[in-house]
Amino acid sequence: MDEKKLTIYFTSDLHGYIYPTDYRGQGEKELGLFKCASRFRKDGNTLVIDGGDILQGSPLGAFCHDTIGSAARFAEMMNRCGYDYVTLGNHDFNYGMPYLDSYLNVLKARCVCENVRWDEAGVRFPARIHTLENGLRVGIIGIVTDYVNIWEKPEHLAGIAITDPIPAVAAALERLRDQVDLTVGIYHGGFERDLATGRVLSYPFYHI
């Protein structure tokens, strides 16, 4: 079998930090969407994916919500960076579904989040199949922690249901099994530290 290559650039938890600044001091910092995107080298066998939590957490995020009332600017900046797929993070629901939709309606990337359903009916953001330039068929499945139901105000989840991610992803894997060569899972959830040892499992900044 001929070897086929897939390159993935992955970001997550940008929390509204688009420019390379922490808003605390002068000088460029090693953080933010544009700093990450400056390292992307994209071709027909490359996917650029984000794992969620883009809309909330920075002064810019607060300005877009409180003053502009729309998250479309974040989508426009993601579009410029060439994202192909995103999933949703728990903080993306903080301002309610209309605000989240103002982002998704402008976003060119496909949103995949298998356990977000239309009031427990159909999947709102189903898994996708992406065929690379080299012919490799890649399944893309996204899921978010269902703890959103505990953390978030019910009115912010109006019109949707966030279900257990495990059976949701299992069903998606079964559905895609005979149609793809490999599957990429994007999960927004988990723990920052090992609960037994306290060892840090994730870091706030990572050089791409």
Language model feature labels by segment:
Residues 1-208:
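Acidic, metal/ion-coordinating pockets
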